[in-house]
């Protein structure tokens, strides 16, 4: 597990998520026993999910089914230790602004040097900012 300043990366992500004002709770959903134990070890809350999910979206759907009373779930990837807590709040606020919204994803303008980076996910949107498709290439 990657360490940053002596702490696991997932702990930094967890702490950033806890700094956001809107979430009532922060839970790490994982299919990895080591991640689960690490989160519990630093006092965080974690749940184990199925290892058979083909994507993170499927994992998130499992979490949503297990927490039917929760209105909004914000998905933060475990490799985002520098995520500004304000981003989490902005995403959560989108659901307050549009009551019929079912899913939202944050996007940012891409730096020119990332255009040809296959690890950088690109999104194509319509004129209203709604995603048409995502691409990692």
Residue spans for each PLM region:
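Short phosphate-binding loop-to-helix
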Residues: 27, 33-76, 80-93
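ATP/adenylate-binding site constellation spanning eukaryotic-like Ser/Thr protein kinases
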Residues: 6, 32, 128
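Short, flexible helix/strand-to-coil boundary loops that buttress conserved ligand/catalytic motifs
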Residues: 21, 39, 135
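N-terminal glycine-rich phosphate-binding loop and ensuing alpha1 helix
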Residues: 1-29
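Active-site donor-binding loop signature of nucleotide-sugar glycosyltransferases
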Residues: 6, 51, 78, 125, ...
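Conserved core of the sugar-phosphate nucleotidyltransferase
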Residues: 83-137
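Short, high-confidence coil segments that cap the C-terminus of an alpha-helix
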Residues: 23, 69-70, 98-101
């Amino acid at each position: 597990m990657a360490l940053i300043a002596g702490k696991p990366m997932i702990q930094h992500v967890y702490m950033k998520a806890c700094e956001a004002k809107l979430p009532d709770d922060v839970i790490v959903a994982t299919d990895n026993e080591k991640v689960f134990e690490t989160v519990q070890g630093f006092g965080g809350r974690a749940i184990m999910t199925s290892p058979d999910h083909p994507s993170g979206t499927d994992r998130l759907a499992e979490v949503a089914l297990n927490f039917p009373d929760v209105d909004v779930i914000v998905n933060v990837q475990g490799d985002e230790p520098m995520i500004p807590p304000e981003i989490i709040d902005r995403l959560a606020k989108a659901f307050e602004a549009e009551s019929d919204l079912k899913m939202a994803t944050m996007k940012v303008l891409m730096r020119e040097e990332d255009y040809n980076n296959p690890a950088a996910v690109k999104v194509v949107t319509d004129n209203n900012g709604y995603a048409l498709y995502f691409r990692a290439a």
